[in-house]
Amino acid sequence: MPDVGIIYNDSKPRACTIAEELQQQLQDRGWGVRLATSQSGLLGYSNPDTVICHTPVESLVPRGFDASLRWAIVLGGDGTVLAAARQLAPIGVPMLTVNTGHLGFLAEAYLDSLPAAIEQLCKGEYSIEERTMMEVKVLRRELIRWEALSLNEMALHREPLTSMCHFEVAIGKHVPVDIAADGVIVSTPTGSTAYSLSSGGPVVTPDVPVFQLVPICPHSLASRALVFANREPMTIFPATPERLMMVVDGNAGCYVWPEDRVLIQRSRYPAQFIRLQPNEFFRVLREKLGWGLPHVAKPSAPDQS
Protein backbone atom coordinates (compact mmCIF):
# COMPACT_ATOMS: atom_id res chain seq x y z
CA MET A 1 0.00 0.00 0.00
CA PRO A 2 1.16 3.59 -0.56
CA ASP A 3 2.11 5.82 2.33
CA VAL A 4 -0.21 8.28 4.03
CA GLY A 5 0.45 11.21 6.35
CA ILE A 6 -0.74 12.51 9.70
CA ILE A 7 -0.37 16.17 10.67
CA TYR A 8 -1.32 17.13 14.21
CA ASN A 9 -1.25 20.05 16.62
CA ASP A 10 1.45 19.06 19.10
CA SER A 11 0.34 21.76 21.55
CA LYS A 12 -2.85 19.79 22.22
CA PRO A 13 -2.31 16.58 24.24
CA ARG A 14 -5.50 15.06 22.85
CA ALA A 15 -4.32 15.52 19.27
CA CYS A 16 -0.92 13.99 20.12
CA THR A 17 -2.54 10.91 21.65
CA ILE A 18 -4.90 10.41 18.72
CA ALA A 19 -2.04 10.82 16.23
CA GLU A 20 -0.10 7.99 17.88
CA GLU A 21 -3.18 5.77 18.01
CA LEU A 22 -4.02 6.45 14.37
CA GLN A 23 -0.47 5.74 13.29
CA GLN A 24 -0.63 2.30 14.88
CA GLN A 25 -4.10 1.55 13.49
CA LEU A 26 -3.11 2.48 9.95
CA GLN A 27 0.13 0.52 10.16
CA ASP A 28 -1.85 -2.51 11.32
CA ARG A 29 -3.91 -2.15 8.13
CA GLY A 30 -0.72 -2.20 6.05
CA TRP A 31 -0.31 1.51 5.36
CA GLY A 32 3.01 3.27 5.66
CA VAL A 33 2.53 6.31 7.88
CA ARG A 34 4.54 9.53 7.97
CA LEU A 35 4.00 11.76 10.97
CA ALA A 36 4.51 15.53 11.26
CA THR A 37 3.35 18.43 13.41
CA SER A 38 1.69 21.54 12.04
CA GLN A 39 4.53 23.75 13.32
CA SER A 40 6.24 24.29 9.96
CA GLY A 41 2.99 25.73 8.63
CA LEU A 42 2.94 28.38 11.36
CA LEU A 43 5.18 31.13 10.03
CA GLY A 44 5.18 33.36 13.09
CA TYR A 45 5.74 37.10 13.10
CA SER A 46 8.76 39.05 11.92
CA ASN A 47 10.47 41.35 14.39
CA PRO A 48 10.60 44.93 13.06
CA ASP A 49 14.18 45.31 14.30
CA THR A 50 15.54 42.29 12.38
CA VAL A 51 15.86 41.43 8.72
CA ILE A 52 12.84 39.56 7.35
CA CYS A 53 13.64 35.94 6.58
CA HIS A 54 12.16 35.06 3.20
CA THR A 55 10.78 31.51 3.31
CA PRO A 56 9.57 30.13 -0.07
CA VAL A 57 6.14 28.52 0.19
CA GLU A 58 7.44 25.18 -1.10
CA SER A 59 9.86 24.90 1.82
CA LEU A 60 7.02 24.47 4.35
CA VAL A 61 6.33 20.89 3.28
CA PRO A 62 7.15 18.63 6.28
CA ARG A 63 10.26 16.51 6.09
CA GLY A 64 9.42 13.10 4.62
CA PHE A 65 6.22 14.32 2.96
CA ASP A 66 5.98 14.32 -0.83
CA ALA A 67 3.52 13.92 -3.70
CA SER A 68 3.54 10.12 -3.37
CA LEU A 69 1.30 10.27 -0.28
CA ARG A 70 -2.23 9.03 -0.94
CA TRP A 71 -3.77 11.38 1.61
CA ALA A 72 -3.14 12.98 4.99
CA ILE A 73 -5.20 13.23 8.17
CA VAL A 74 -5.10 16.60 9.96
CA LEU A 75 -5.82 16.60 13.71
CA GLY A 76 -6.57 19.93 15.39
CA GLY A 77 -8.75 23.00 15.15
CA ASP A 78 -9.22 25.47 12.31
CA GLY A 79 -5.79 27.01 12.95
CA THR A 80 -4.17 23.61 12.43
CA VAL A 81 -6.10 23.16 9.18
CA LEU A 82 -4.89 26.55 7.91
CA ALA A 83 -1.30 25.59 8.71
CA ALA A 84 -1.66 22.12 7.18
CA ALA A 85 -3.04 23.62 3.97
CA ARG A 86 0.23 25.53 3.55
CA GLN A 87 2.17 22.33 4.21
CA LEU A 88 0.26 20.05 1.84
CA ALA A 89 -0.92 22.27 -1.03
CA PRO A 90 2.52 22.52 -2.73
CA ILE A 91 2.69 18.71 -3.06
CA GLY A 92 -0.97 18.22 -3.97
CA VAL A 93 -1.88 15.88 -1.11
CA PRO A 94 -5.58 15.86 -0.09
CA MET A 95 -6.38 16.13 3.62
CA LEU A 96 -9.10 14.79 5.88
CA THR A 97 -9.66 17.38 8.59
CA VAL A 98 -10.59 16.03 12.02
CA ASN A 99 -11.63 18.56 14.65
CA THR A 100 -10.06 18.35 18.11
CA GLY A 101 -10.58 22.07 18.79
CA HIS A 102 -13.60 24.32 19.30
CA LEU A 103 -15.60 25.67 16.34
CA GLY A 104 -14.20 23.35 13.69
CA PHE A 105 -15.64 25.30 10.76
CA LEU A 106 -13.19 23.62 8.38
CA ALA A 107 -13.58 20.13 9.88
CA GLU A 108 -14.93 17.20 7.89
CA ALA A 109 -14.95 14.69 10.76
CA TYR A 110 -15.11 14.69 14.55
CA LEU A 111 -13.64 12.41 17.18
CA ASP A 112 -16.88 10.54 17.84
CA SER A 113 -17.14 9.59 14.16
CA LEU A 114 -13.42 9.04 13.56
CA PRO A 115 -13.47 5.19 13.35
CA ALA A 116 -16.16 5.28 10.64
CA ALA A 117 -14.31 8.07 8.83
CA ILE A 118 -11.07 6.08 8.78
CA GLU A 119 -12.90 3.02 7.47
CA GLN A 120 -14.43 5.05 4.66
CA LEU A 121 -11.11 6.72 3.91
CA CYS A 122 -9.22 3.42 3.66
CA LYS A 123 -11.85 2.07 1.26
CA GLY A 124 -11.44 5.09 -1.00
CA GLU A 125 -15.07 6.14 -0.54
CA TYR A 126 -14.59 9.88 -0.68
CA SER A 127 -14.41 12.84 -3.03
CA ILE A 128 -11.95 15.73 -3.19
CA GLU A 129 -12.94 19.39 -3.10
CA GLU A 130 -10.40 21.99 -4.17
CA ARG A 131 -10.32 25.34 -2.39
CA THR A 132 -8.53 28.35 -3.85
CA MET A 133 -5.53 29.70 -1.96
CA MET A 134 -3.89 33.12 -2.26
CA GLU A 135 -0.21 33.77 -2.73
CA VAL A 136 0.79 36.82 -0.70
CA LYS A 137 4.13 38.53 -1.31
CA VAL A 138 5.75 41.60 0.21
CA LEU A 139 8.00 43.23 -2.39
CA ARG A 140 10.53 46.03 -2.19
CA ARG A 141 11.27 47.00 -5.76
CA GLU A 142 11.64 43.51 -7.33
CA LEU A 143 12.98 41.76 -4.23
CA ILE A 144 10.64 39.34 -2.44
CA ARG A 145 10.97 40.12 1.27
CA TRP A 146 8.26 37.77 2.55
CA GLU A 147 5.68 35.38 1.10
CA ALA A 148 3.04 32.93 2.25
CA LEU A 149 0.10 30.87 1.06
CA SER A 150 -3.26 31.85 2.50
CA LEU A 151 -6.44 29.78 2.66
CA ASN A 152 -8.47 32.43 4.49
CA GLU A 153 -7.28 36.01 4.28
CA MET A 154 -4.59 38.66 4.37
CA ALA A 155 -5.15 41.65 6.66
CA LEU A 156 -3.03 44.80 6.38
CA HIS A 157 -3.72 47.30 9.13
CA ARG A 158 -2.31 50.02 11.33
CA GLU A 159 -0.52 49.44 14.60
CA PRO A 160 -2.20 50.35 17.89
CA LEU A 161 -2.04 54.04 18.85
CA THR A 162 -1.39 55.15 15.27
CA SER A 163 -3.68 57.13 12.98
CA MET A 164 -5.89 55.99 10.14
CA CYS A 165 -4.14 54.49 7.11
CA HIS A 166 -4.32 55.27 3.42
CA PHE A 167 -3.93 52.63 0.72
CA GLU A 168 -3.71 52.69 -3.04
CA VAL A 169 -5.16 49.45 -4.41
CA ALA A 170 -4.68 48.30 -8.01
CA ILE A 171 -6.57 45.29 -9.39
CA GLY A 172 -5.20 44.00 -12.68
CA LYS A 173 -4.89 46.85 -15.15
CA HIS A 174 -7.80 48.82 -13.73
CA VAL A 175 -7.44 52.34 -12.40
CA PRO A 176 -6.16 52.22 -8.78
CA VAL A 177 -8.53 53.20 -5.99
CA ASP A 178 -7.73 55.02 -2.75
CA ILE A 179 -8.98 53.70 0.58
CA ALA A 180 -8.85 55.48 3.94
CA ALA A 181 -9.43 53.02 6.77
CA ASP A 182 -7.86 51.27 9.74
CA GLY A 183 -6.85 48.52 7.34
CA VAL A 184 -7.93 46.28 4.49
CA ILE A 185 -8.71 42.57 4.23
CA VAL A 186 -8.32 40.49 1.09
CA SER A 187 -10.00 37.12 1.43
CA THR A 188 -10.72 33.95 -0.50
CA PRO A 189 -14.23 32.45 -0.61
CA THR A 190 -13.13 30.12 2.21
CA GLY A 191 -12.07 33.15 4.25
CA SER A 192 -15.32 35.00 3.59
CA THR A 193 -16.76 33.42 6.76
CA ALA A 194 -13.82 34.53 8.93
CA TYR A 195 -12.32 37.99 9.59
CA SER A 196 -13.89 39.35 6.41
CA LEU A 197 -17.38 38.46 7.64
CA SER A 198 -16.75 40.18 10.97
CA SER A 199 -15.77 43.34 9.06
CA GLY A 200 -18.96 43.47 7.02
CA GLY A 201 -17.93 41.46 3.97
CA PRO A 202 -20.31 39.09 2.17
CA VAL A 203 -20.37 35.31 2.47
CA VAL A 204 -19.12 33.72 -0.77
CA THR A 205 -19.65 30.06 -1.60
CA PRO A 206 -16.35 28.17 -2.01
CA ASP A 207 -16.85 27.35 -5.70
CA VAL A 208 -16.97 30.97 -6.88
CA PRO A 209 -13.63 32.05 -8.50
CA VAL A 210 -13.32 35.41 -6.77
CA PHE A 211 -11.45 37.30 -4.07
CA GLN A 212 -12.89 40.12 -2.02
CA LEU A 213 -11.47 43.38 -0.71
CA VAL A 214 -12.99 44.52 2.59
CA PRO A 215 -12.00 47.80 4.31
CA ILE A 216 -11.65 47.75 8.10
CA CYS A 217 -13.51 50.67 9.71
CA PRO A 218 -13.39 52.85 6.56
CA HIS A 219 -13.64 56.63 6.90
CA SER A 220 -16.16 56.95 4.09
CA LEU A 221 -19.84 56.18 3.62
CA ALA A 222 -19.05 55.07 0.06
CA SER A 223 -16.34 52.56 0.98
CA ARG A 224 -17.77 49.05 0.71
CA ALA A 225 -16.55 45.50 0.21
CA LEU A 226 -15.59 44.67 -3.38
CA VAL A 227 -15.78 41.22 -4.98
CA PHE A 228 -13.55 40.69 -8.03
CA ALA A 229 -12.36 37.85 -10.27
CA ASN A 230 -9.37 36.01 -8.83
CA ARG A 231 -7.69 35.74 -12.23
CA GLU A 232 -6.44 39.31 -11.77
CA PRO A 233 -3.61 40.13 -9.35
CA MET A 234 -4.01 42.82 -6.72
CA THR A 235 -1.29 45.19 -5.57
CA ILE A 236 -1.61 47.25 -2.40
CA PHE A 237 0.63 50.29 -1.97
CA PRO A 238 0.79 51.79 1.55
CA ALA A 239 0.24 55.54 1.32
CA THR A 240 1.02 56.32 4.93
CA PRO A 241 4.34 57.23 6.59
CA GLU A 242 4.02 54.69 9.42
CA ARG A 243 4.79 51.00 9.12
CA LEU A 244 1.83 48.64 8.86
CA MET A 245 1.18 45.16 10.19
CA MET A 246 0.28 42.33 7.82
CA VAL A 247 -1.30 39.14 9.17
CA VAL A 248 -2.05 36.07 7.06
CA ASP A 249 -4.65 33.56 8.27
CA GLY A 250 -4.28 34.89 11.80
CA ASN A 251 -1.00 33.06 12.46
CA ALA A 252 1.67 34.58 10.23
CA GLY A 253 2.76 38.05 9.36
CA CYS A 254 5.33 40.76 8.98
CA TYR A 255 5.69 44.53 8.99
CA VAL A 256 5.10 46.43 5.77
CA TRP A 257 6.93 49.72 5.29
CA PRO A 258 6.01 52.70 3.08
CA GLU A 259 8.54 51.63 0.43
CA ASP A 260 7.03 48.11 0.19
CA ARG A 261 4.08 46.82 -1.79
CA VAL A 262 1.90 43.76 -1.25
CA LEU A 263 1.14 41.53 -4.24
CA ILE A 264 -1.78 39.11 -3.96
CA GLN A 265 -2.69 36.59 -6.62
CA ARG A 266 -4.34 33.21 -6.98
CA SER A 267 -1.92 30.45 -6.04
CA ARG A 268 -1.22 27.62 -8.43
CA TYR A 269 -1.51 25.35 -5.37
CA PRO A 270 -5.11 24.74 -4.27
CA ALA A 271 -5.94 23.19 -0.91
CA GLN A 272 -7.53 19.77 -1.37
CA PHE A 273 -10.18 18.70 1.14
CA ILE A 274 -11.41 15.13 1.43
CA ARG A 275 -15.21 14.94 1.62
CA LEU A 276 -16.83 11.84 3.11
CA GLN A 277 -20.30 13.04 2.15
CA PRO A 278 -21.64 15.60 -0.35
CA ASN A 279 -20.49 19.02 0.82
CA GLU A 280 -23.45 21.19 1.79
CA PHE A 281 -22.04 24.65 2.42
CA PHE A 282 -25.32 26.16 3.60
CA ARG A 283 -25.75 23.39 6.15
CA VAL A 284 -22.32 24.24 7.57
CA LEU A 285 -23.28 27.93 7.65
CA ARG A 286 -26.43 27.09 9.54
CA GLU A 287 -24.80 24.72 12.03
CA LYS A 288 -21.65 26.75 12.72
CA LEU A 289 -22.78 30.36 12.32
CA GLY A 290 -26.54 30.13 12.79
CA TRP A 291 -27.25 31.42 9.27
CA GLY A 292 -30.84 31.22 8.02
CA LEU A 293 -32.34 29.74 11.17
CA PRO A 294 -36.12 30.10 11.35
CA HIS A 295 -37.54 32.68 13.71
CA VAL A 296 -39.05 30.93 16.69
CA ALA A 297 -41.13 33.96 17.56
CA LYS A 298 -41.48 37.32 15.86
CA PRO A 299 -41.84 40.47 17.93
CA SER A 300 -45.49 41.42 18.20
CA ALA A 301 -46.87 44.83 17.27
CA PRO A 302 -47.56 47.28 20.09
CA ASP A 303 -51.01 47.11 21.58
CA GLN A 304 -53.09 49.84 19.90
CA SER A 305 -56.12 49.50 22.19
From Swiss-Prot:
Belongs to the NAD kinase family. Its cofactor is a divalent metal cation. It comes from the Bacteria. One of its GO terms (molecular function) is metal ion binding. It catalyses: NAD(+) + ATP = ADP + NADP(+) + H(+). GO terms for cellular component: cytoplasm. NAD(+) binds at residues 78-79, 152-153, 182, 193-198, 251. Its EC number is 2.7.1.23. InterPro entries: ATP-NAD_kinase_N, ATP-NAD_kinase_PpnK-typ_C, NAD/diacylglycerol_kinase_sf, NADK. Keywords: ATP-binding, Cytoplasm, Kinase, NAD, NADP, Nucleotide-binding, Transferase. Pfam families: NAD_kinase, NAD_kinase_C. Involved in the regulation of the intracellular balance of NAD and NADP, and is a key enzyme in the biosynthesis of NADP. Catalyzes specifically the phosphorylation on 2'-hydroxyl of the adenosine moiety of NAD to yield NADP. The keyword ATP-binding applies. The active site is at 78 (proton acceptor). GO terms for biological process: NAD metabolic process; NADP biosynthetic process. The keyword Cytoplasm applies. This is NAD kinase 2. It is found in: Cytoplasm. It comes from Synechococcus sp. (strain ATCC 27144 / PCC 6301 / SAUG 1402/1). Gene3D superfamilies: Probable inorganic polyphosphate/atp-NAD kinase, domain 1, Probable inorganic polyphosphate/atp-NAD kinase, domain 2.
